[in-house]
Every structure is written in C-alpha cells, then in structure tokens.
Amino acid sequence: LSGGMAQRVALVRTLINEPEILLLDEPLGALDEFTRMNMQDEILNIWSQKKQLALMVTHSIDEAVYMGTRVLVMESNPGRIVADIRIDEDFPRDRSSASFVEYRNEILNRLHFGGKKTE
C-alpha cells in the first residue's frame, strides 16, 4: 500500500469501532505534502459527518490551524502548555488567507520562532 492508502486503512480501522473520542497521534506525519493535504480534508469530512470529539497531536503548525478548533501549544523541557488558541474560522479554511497566516504566526511567536513576542 502507498503511504496515503496505509493512512486511510489505519483511519478506517479506528473509525470502525465508533469511538466516542477520536484520538489521532501524528496520523499524517509520514505523508508527502499533497497526500497529507488530501488526508486532512478526508479527516475533516469524516469529523463533520460524525460530529464526534477528536483530539489530534501534530508537529505541523499549518495542520493544527487548518484542522483545529482549539490549538494547545506546548514547549518542551519540561513539556507544558504555553498557549490555548481558539481558531474562530469556518470550515473549509483557506490556507492563504490573512487570518490563517495570523494564527500560524501567533503559534510561531508562542514558540519563540516569530519576529515579535505575543503576551
């Protein structure tokens, strides 16, 4: 199976049991960018149909902003939450919109990778 097909199979295996909470730990981390974006849309479609709670762990800031309604930003050493950001945008989201870029920059600033600090 291709990476995308393997991820689809893993997602179906998770959903077949109809869990109350959908737990996704880096589900798209091993995919190329285009397959990853397609899978993000597939997961969002499933999520919108099932209307179930989903918790997703990702290291991709764009993925968190694109898919999340709430983003908990963590720092390491020790692992702690440094920001709780609500993404107040409707789905589907435009990755090139000004608000998307603002959310991404806010997260980068919280991780000290941006040009200015966010308090």
List each model region and its residues.
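ABC ATPase nucleotide-binding domain "signature motif"
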Residues: S2-R8
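Hydrophobic anchor residue at the start of the ABC signature
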Residues: L11
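Conserved signature/switch motifs of ABC ATPase nucleotide-binding domains
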Residues: N17
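Catalytic Walker B motif of ABC-type/P-loop ATPase nucleotide-binding domains
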Residues: L22-D25
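Helical segment within the ABC ATPase nucleotide-binding domain
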Residues: R36-K50
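Conserved H-loop
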Residues: K51-V57
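Conserved catalytic segment of ABC-fold P-loop ATPases
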Residues: Y66-V73
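Conserved beta-strand-loop-alpha-helix hinge in the C-terminal portion
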Residues: S76-E106
